[in-house]
Amino acid sequence: KNIFGTTVKVCEMQSEGGAAGAVHGSLATGALTTTYTASQGLLLMIPNMYKIAAEQLPTVFHVSARTVSTQALNIFGDHSDVMACRQTGFAMLAEGNVQEVMDLSAVAHLAAIKGRVPFLNFFDGFRTSHEIQKIQVWDYDDLAEMCDMDAVRSFREHSLNPERPAMRGSHENGDIFFQHRESCNSIYNDLPAVVEEYMEKVNAKLGTNYQLFNYYGAPDAERVIVAMGSICDVAEEVIDYLNA
C-alpha cells in the first residue's frame, strides 16, 4: 500500500503512447498516477505531456535516460530522450546515483503535488538504473508527514466527476488561447522554491545536503564543470584525487 493506505494498481498498456494516455486520463479523474519509460518510449509520450503539464496535473514520469536510436540502435545512457521533452512544460529533476534516486524521486512527487507541475525525473540509463548498491530506504510515515494533504484534496476536488460536471478540452481562438497559456507562468516561477523546501525537509530527516545546484571543490577554482547525472560522482572523485 502507498502512504494513503491504498493498494497501488499497476496497468500494462499496449505501448508507451497508450501508457501516457492512460496516465493522463487517470490523473484527470483524480488518481495520483506515475509511469516509467526511456528512449523512444518517452518520445511517444510527448503529445500527452503537453496536455498533462498545461492542465497542471501532478504526475512524475521516471526515466532511465537512454540514447534515442538514430542510424543504429543504441540502448546505452545519454540525455537525448529527456532533452527532447524540455518544451513540454514538465519540470526536470536529475539524479547522479542510486541513493539520490531514492531521495529525490520523493522530492519530485511531493513538489509535483504542491507545485501543480508534473515532473520528468531522470537518471542515467544502465549506469545508474541497473546499479546494485546498498541504499537507505524511506519510511512511508516520513513521506506521509511531508505530503501536502491540502494540495492532494484540491487536486481531487478539481478532477472530472459526473457529480460535478465541468468542461475540459475546449477549443479556443488565438485571442484567448495565448492568455490562458501564459496564466500558468506564476506556478512555474514558484516551483524552484517548492522543490528547495522539500529538499530541505529531506536534508533535515536524512542528514543530506540536497540543493537545486550543489557546488563541490575549491572556492577559488579557476575551472568549473557544470554537470548532472552519474558524471557528478566521478567528477568529485577526480577533484579529491587531484587535490590530495
Predicted regions and their residues:
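Redox- and metal-dependent alpha/beta enzyme cores, enriched for Fe-S-associated oxidoreductases
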Residues: 212-244
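Short helix/loop capping segments that flank catalytic or ligand/cofactor-binding pockets
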Residues: 45, 71, 130-132, 234-236
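Conformationally flexible catalytic loops at phosphate/diphosphate-handling active centers
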Residues: 119-215
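Gly-rich Lys/Arg/Thr-decorated short loops/hinges at beta-loop-alpha junctions or inter-strand turns
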Residues: 2-6, 62-63, 85-89, 178-197, ...
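Glycine-rich beta-alpha junction loops
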Residues: 66-67, 123-130, 229-231
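Thiamine diphosphate
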Residues: 1-84, 90-113
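Short, solvent-exposed amphipathic alpha-helical segments in soluble enzyme
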Residues: 50-52, 109-111, 136-139, 237-243
